[in-house]
Each structure stands twice: as C-alpha cells, then as structure tokens.
Amino acid sequence: MDSVTTLQCQNLTCLSPNALTNRFCEKCGTPLVKRYLWMMGDWVRTYYHVGELIDNRYLVKQPQIVLDTKPAQAPQAPEEPPSWLSLYLKLLPFHLHIPQVYGYIPSPDERLNMDIWLLEYGTIPLDQTGELIYPELLPTLAEVWSQASDLRQIHWLWQMAKLWHPLQRKAVVSSLLNPSLTRVNNQLLQLLELSKDEANAPNLKDLGAFWTGLIPTAAANIQDFLVSLTQELESGDLDRPESLIAILDYALQHYGGGQERSYEIFTCTDTGLMREHNEDACYPPTNQAITLAHGQNPLAIVCDGIGGQEGGEIAAQLAIETLSREINPSPTTNIEVYPDSYSLVLEQAIRVTNDLISQRNDQESRQDRQRMGTTLVMAFAQAQEMYAAHVGDSRIYWITAHSCHQVTVDDDLASREVKLGYLLYRDAIQYPNAGALVQALGMSSANNLHPTVQRLIIDQDCVFLLCSDGLSDYDRVEQYWDSEIVPLLRGEKNVTAVGESLLQLANQKNGHDNSTIALVYCRVVPAAEPVTPLVYAEAKERIIPDLNDQDFDHSGDTYPGEEVVTAIPTPPPASSSVSSRTSPPALTRVSPLVVVAIAVGVLGLLAAIAWQFLSHNPPSNPPISPAPVTGPSPTTGTTPPAPVTDTNPGTTPPAPVTDTNPGTTPPAPVTGPSPTTGTTPSAPVTGPSPPNASPN
C-alpha cells in the first residue's frame, strides 16, 4: 500500500498530497514532516501488517510503528483520557526523556476494546530518504553503549539518575531498568514506554545491578570508576538518588575537561508584516556575530513583551537590561563551580527582573490588562553545561546534526491542562484560549513566579535556537530545522546567514507577529591534554560529606517545568478584542512563614495534649481534620477549566494582562516530547488488551 499512500503537506495553506519519498512539497516547497509514532500494546504486532493504512491515515511502517500521513490534522482524542494514561501527561515536564501521547485510533468494533494509543518522541533518526534508521524507532542503550565516548556514557547514566526520583514518585521507576524500554536518541536517554512497578518497587541496588552489565563495554578510562560506583550501589552504601547524581555530576565535570568548547552568537529581530512596532527584545545586540573562545561563558536572551500602551516593549527592554547586568558572563577559570550553582544565579536574576517590572507597573498605576510583562528564554553556558531558563511561551530548541528537540514547555493553559492529566497536548491546543499564558515576567511579585531552569550537557557540536512565537508558531521550526539550521553544523553556512534566513522565513511563512531569534552555536573539539581516569574515592570524598550534612525531603519537590498547580486562575474567554496571549496571574507557593506558623501550632497542640495527659484530664476537643483541597475540573468543550482552589487564600491576584496587539494562538509544539529509558517492568502502563481480536 506504500505505493499509493501519499503524505500530506503540513502547510495549512497548501495541504497537497505528496509521494512518501519526497522531502519537500511539490506544490509549495515546504519541507515535509514525517511523524513516526509508536502503537501501544503488543497485540497490534499481529493484528496489523506493514503497508496497511489504519483509519485512512496511519501507515504501518514496522510492527507497532506508524507514519502519520496527515500531520496537518489534529489527531483524535477522547473526551476524557483513561486514568492509566495520565502518568504520561503529568510527566510532561520530562518530555525530553518520556514520550507524550499523540492521540488514539478508536476501536473499529465498539464491542471490542481495540483502541490504539499513539506515542510521539520528538525527532526520530531518519536516513536521507526519510525512512527509519532503526526498525524500532530508537536503539536500545545496550546497542549503542560501546560506541559512545566516556563523557557521553556518563551523561546517559546521569540522565537515568536524574529521572529516578520523579519516576519513583509515579510508581514507574522500573521503566529505567528494562533494557527493551531504555532507548537512546542521540545525546538523550529516552523511554519507549512506561511500565508499572510491582509491589516491591526497585531501589538503587537494582540500578547498580543494571549498570554492572554495561561495564565490560564501557570506555576504558571510566571502567574502574563504574566498578566502584556499582559496588556501592549494590551494597546499599550509596542509597540516595541525590548522592548518586552528585557523584555523576563530579564525573561529568571531570570528563568534560577532555573537550574544549567555543561559541558563536547571533541575534536578530523584526517587527513583522502585521505589527506597527516591535515589542520583542534580545541580547547580545542584534545583527552582529559574536565569537567566544574556550573558557568564555556565552549568554543569550530573547524577550517577547506583553501589555498595553507600548508597555510590552518597555518590559522586554527592561528585562534585557536587568538580566544582562545581573548575570556575569565572565570566564570562571580557576574558580570551583558546583553543579547547579548557576541555576540559583539565573533564577535569582529572573526574580529580580520580575520585581523591577512589577514595581514599574505599580509606579505607573497599571492595573489589570494594562499591566506590562514579558516572556523570557535565556541560555547560559559554563564548561560542559548549558543552562536553559524560560518563563512564558517563547522557546528554546536544541539542534544537532541529526536531531531537533524542544527544550522548553510553554507556560500556557494547554500545557497546564496536560500536566494536570486532563487533556492530550495536541487536543488541548485546539481549545479557545489554549495559548493564554499562565505566567510572564512582571505581572506580580516574584513570590508568585515559577521560572524553569534546566541544565543540559554539551558533548558534541550543536545549536541552541531561542525564539519568540513569531517564528515557532505553526510548527515552523519542526519543518525547517533540517534544511535551515543543520547546514551551519555542516560548515555550509555561517551563523549570520542562518539567523537572517530564519528571520526571513518567519516573516514569509508567519508574519503575524514580531519575530526575534538568538542562535548559540557551540563547537566541540578534543582538549590538548586528555583527561586521566577518575578515581571513585576522590569523587566520593569531595561530594558525600557535603550531602550528608543535608536532610532531603522530596515530599514537596518540583522539577524542571513542573509547577505547583493549585492556584492558577483561569482567564476570561477569548473575544475579538482579547489576544490568545492573555496572561493570567502566576502560580502561588505557600509562604515559608505560613509553614513556620503551622509547625509552631502543631508543637503547641502536642504540648497541650501532653499537659492534659500528665494532669489525668482527658482531652476535651475532638481531633481536627483538614478540609480537602479542591482540584480543578477537567476542561471540556470550549469552556475554560475552573480555577483550582488556593490552599492559602488571602491575596487577590491581579487581572490577566492582554497583549494589545492580537496574535494567533500557537498550534501544537514544533517538536513532540522526546522519550527516555526503561527497565523490565512487571506490567506496561497500557490499557487492557482487546478480547481475542483478530483481523478480518
């Protein structure tokens, strides 16, 4: 059936059918997007055959793998996702490692449970003809382990360690120990699926046993280190994920010294075809390429202003001035830098910037929709680390010669609904006001702001693209990254030419909004002196004493992009005069003072009970049960979801601020989330198997 099946152009003004072998649309020239998806459930391997077209849309390319031949159309989604599927949705903040649910194919027979759920992984390795390089989408960790460098191998293990606690909280950590689920997508560790933990959930001893099997084919200069590390894990001497992460961080810093990194940065901005003035801003200054040698720390920022009476332009420029001043990009040679230390620096700078804009709003008596604010994306590199920070819906993409991954998750209503487990992402973005922001810089106090700062490891040539939605809307990056940005990595174009080409593309293909772009091009070469093998005892001695002084409590933790979702007001419905980029007030954390007050109250209550007991007087008051916290209702139809009840009421957040220059609601993210690793779980997180399903 391949010979007669066509691939639809994703350009909404074209939608022409094309041969499956085409790379570009024959009619409009748009690069054709090939989305390969994984069908959940082993039963589909025998029920559907290669070459078969399912639901007049999904072409079976391999057992359990289909190609979406109509990528411009929204996939089907149920009114309410089944409860077992919510694990994937709630793990959206970890989309670089865990697949997201693309959609589903309803059962052809209502009497049988034969619904097919589809998973997407971002960029999949393809050959020049657009066909799969690996017959099961991605290679297993074991398949490619022996071919990787020492730094890449430590990098993969570090990613597994970082995922341990988040997956443990969801009772799917056994996924990391399943060799068939633990896959690799270039530099990223990705899970093919999630699998449920058994009654006896795995612990770090099991992780140590899994890693022991990798030692014989590990890079020679990390084998001794891994032997000692796995022995400590299996013996139980190393029993905390944070200690394991710290040791691997030390190893990353050590082996990262075996490479030198230089950077080129280029920024550009344009008003667009439909706007009268430009409310975007960026850093460094536009239209001049900047080269940074090894040891210099690059900083790039893009802001997209929001607010009436030219307030957005003021907010964006104020953010650029403050952040570039607060963050010191000077070299840090001969200074010992601890892992994640710059995360705190960046987050603090973002909070300072937020309060300066908020105070400006208050000084100018800006209320409700006249308050000004701005989105933010920022990239800052230190040694082998790239820190990616964001607030709002501007985006960062991580591009290599073979992959493009969206690093950030938009701070909008659509993403919020997904993280709450209510809607599939590609369904959520179809709703009115789906692109309304849930937070932006300057709308209220920094106490209500939750910036996301992620730490990425650079071990190969790559490009970080920072952009406002003037470029990213309508999946333009997903369509054009390979043809427009990869030539930079091949040495066929320079960074200036690529930046100018992307800006021109934004105006030609979108043009509805201001467009701003920052390119951070990183070149990686071997260091003049190779690194010596790391001695495990050295890493442990340097790291563990510091960690033993800390008491870790993960009960209230949030992770990159994961928000406290108990106080997000819902904006009013969109109207002809209200932009989709309305910005509701930010999230609210419980004040530390409230926590202290509660603790003091509990201690006082215990003291009173003790006194009554000693006095032989029975307690006169009944036990106190806290009232349950009301959760938000699922979004259905076109009605925005009800706001979640704040557990700490008392402050009324300001009304949403609207961008006075109406834009368009962004479509699906340019790249779907990327998967991670796995273990042999007892039961996969899937729906029930169809009863005796057989093909006609």
Regions found by a protein language model. Give the residues of each.
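Long, intrinsically disordered low-complexity tandem-repeat segments
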Residues: 629-690
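PP2C/PPM-type serine/threonine phosphatase catalytic domain
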Residues: 4-6, 13, 20-32, 60-159, ...
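Intrinsically disordered, low-complexity acidic Ser/Thr-rich regulatory segments
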Residues: 2-8, 26, 36-47
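Eukaryotic nuclear, charge-biased low-complexity tracts
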Residues: 55-56, 203-204
